Amino acid sequence: MPAAIRALIAGNWKMNGLKAQLAEFEAMLAGAPALADKADLLVCPPATLLHAFGQKLGNGARSFAVGAQDCHANVSGAHTGDLSAEMLVDAGASAIIVGHSERRADHGETDSVVRAKAEAAWRAGAVAIVCVGETQAERDAGQTLDVVGRQLAGSLPDGATAENTVVAYEPVWAIGTGLTPTANDVEQVHKFIRDCLTKRFGGEGAAVRILYGGSVKPSNAKELMAVPEVNGALVGGASLKAADFLAIAAGCP
């Protein structure tokens, strides 16, 4: 991981967490100061907990933030059940995940939809965490780089910078399966992503953080975080427990 790019460990709680889980978040906050020289920390709880988590953060200066897992592209309107980026930021989010593979698969989100959501996050003043990644079938067909390149081109709006954008590479076949690609495979894809970002966005693209996601856990975090062009992790299930989440952050160089 280049020393110039500070690591980000982002936790995606997905559809998990009730008020009782505030204790886990408080434990994360308690352990965060010891990791201040390692990484920035971000937790994206379900929207029902976003405000409560934000209140726990308070106004103190620390490298810890809360974010959201998705947003609607519009500011407001007749979109029953949806939440705009502005609403999420108002509730305390400073970053919003867009284009997660589960949204792409379960809700049919296309690259153009993801792009609009990324623009919405920027509009509201939030960082867009744009997810890309191939399925098992695409991997087996040798299409990984083609798929990732196409998703990057279609999902990232013009104007991406290191301040408003994070890219997360999540091979779909590795999410929640316990399977992880080899370090060499991760390096190949992350270097490809970096090349795409630099060619399109120049110096800003060279500084955008690229996270790895897909069965990241304490036992493999150190190896993954040592891979060139891996600037942190997007963590799923392991982010639900403070001990695991903090241990993953401790694996950053």
From Swiss-Prot:
The protein's enzyme class: isomerase
Domain of life per record = Bacteria
Residues at the active site:
100, 170
Q: Which residues form a coiled coil?
A: none
| Keyword flag Iron | no
Alphabetical list of Pfam families matching this protein: TIM
What UniProt keywords apply to this chain's record, in alphabetical order?
A: Cytoplasm, Gluconeogenesis, Glycolysis, Isomerase
| GO MF, one example | triose-phosphate isomerase activity
- Predominant location: cytoplasm
User: Which pathway is this protein engaged in?
Assistant: Carbohydrate biosynthesis; gluconeogenesis; Carbohydrate degradation; glycolysis; D-glyceraldehyde 3-phosphate from glycerone phosphate: step 1/1
Q: Which residues bind substrate?
A: 12-14, 176, 215, 236-237
List the CDD domains. Answer: TIM
The family this protein is said to belong to: Belongs to the triosephosphate isomerase family.
According to its UniProt entry, this protein's organism is Rhodopseudomonas palustris (strain BisA53)
Oligomeric state and interaction partners are given as: Homodimer.
Q: What is this protein called?
A: Triosephosphate isomerase
